[in-house]
Each structure stands twice: as C-alpha cells, then as structure tokens.
Amino acid sequence: MDGLLIDSEPLWQEAAQESLEGLGVTIDDDLYASTIGLRTRECLEHWFTHFGIDHVLIPATDEDITARVILKVEKSGRLMNGVIKAMDLMEQLGYRIGLATSSPTSLIKKVLSKTNLEGRFHAIASAEFLPFGKPHPQVYLDCAMSLRSIPSSCICFEDSFNGMIAAKAARMKCIVIPSPAAAHKSVWGAADLTLASLDDLTKETLLRI
C-alpha cells in the first residue's frame, strides 16, 4: 500500500524522524530504506538495536509514529501515478483485487477514505496482528485465501524488497515498481517483472506474466 497505492513513504520517514528526534537520534536514508516494507514495530526493533535504545520504548513510539502518519496522509496523501488506470484495467480483465499490507488497520482505513478507493478491493489483509510481517508470506497467503484464489494464480505488485520476498515466498508472481531512488539497485532479480510506474501496466503484461 505505502509507496505503491499512495505516496506515503516520505510521510513515514518524516514521521519516524520527528518521533525519534525526541530520543536524540537521526535516521539516515540508507537505514530507513533497509526497513521499507516491514511493520513499524519491526522497523523500530531494528533502529533501536542500531542506536542502543531501550526496546521498552517501542510500543509508545510505534503508536506515535502511526498517529503522525495518519495526520500526514489526511493532510497531503496522494495516489501514486497509474493506480486508477491499473485497477480499472484489472477489473476489466476480471481480476479480483486484494490489498495485502504491513500497515495497521487504522491507516488502511484512512488511506482508502482519502483516496476514494473504498469498495475497490475484494479482500484486505493486514499483517498488523500476525506473528510475522513481511518478508514472511503470511499476509499474502491470508489475502489469497480471502480472494478464494490459489497463491500461484496471484500477481502481486510491490515497491519494496521485503514485500517482493514475501510475495515470492508465497509462490506468487511479483511485479515490482521500486521508487526512483531504489530502481538502480541490484536486488530485484527475484521479481517476474520490473516497471517504472503502474502507468506502464498493460493488458499484454498481465496476460503474459
């Protein structure tokens, strides 16, 4: 969802930095990028270990960051290029569309409301309360089950390395649409296809993959 449907990764990074400033640390771009696709608490576990911060502060920091992101999405959240076009195309071809995300339910509701995508998904699965989030495949498997689809018949769209690994671990096809800052990295080899934008998705691509 984040970075694929809505341009919210910069908002997450801003929120995380604002929250962690109170703890006296700064998250650089590389450290932040290494955790894209993970649940917030797992990002915090990684960051707190890196900086030597007491993990007892994770739950409160998790809540603070999520609250900040929800406010930022309400204020300035916008759809990524090609989202509506891609969803229209998939609906025309008879695909059932699911949303499998690491984001919490509170943010999912805000994003769908803000972007007028409510009602466009046949299934929604959040890793919020799962034992493991991405790169574990469970959230994708749960979404496939809700769609009444076998995993190998599903096509996933991802913008993160952790999400791509989750999709492939679920034995699904995966189209990656990395951010411009990550597109040059040599980590996308497991994907079935790489696109610059959802604007580039075509009927031929979907039928061929």
Regions found by a protein language model. Give the residues of each.
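Asp-based, Mg2+/Mn2+-dependent phosphohydrolase catalytic module
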Residues: 88-91, 104-209
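Metal-dependent phosphoesterase signature
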Residues: 46-85, 93-95
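Conserved phosphate-coupling serine/threonine residues in phosphotransfer and NTP-handling enzymes
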Residues: 4, 101-103
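Active-site neighborhood of HAD-like aspartate-dependent phosphohydrolases
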Residues: 1-34
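An amphipathic alpha-helix signature
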Residues: 13, 17, 37-45, 62, ...
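Short phosphate-binding/catalytic loops that engage adenosine nucleotides
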Residues: 25, 94-95, 172
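Helix N-cap/coil-helix junction residues
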Residues: 25-27, 53, 117, 149
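Helix-loop "lid/cap" segments that line or gate small-molecule binding pockets
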Residues: 19-20, 39-54, 111, 144
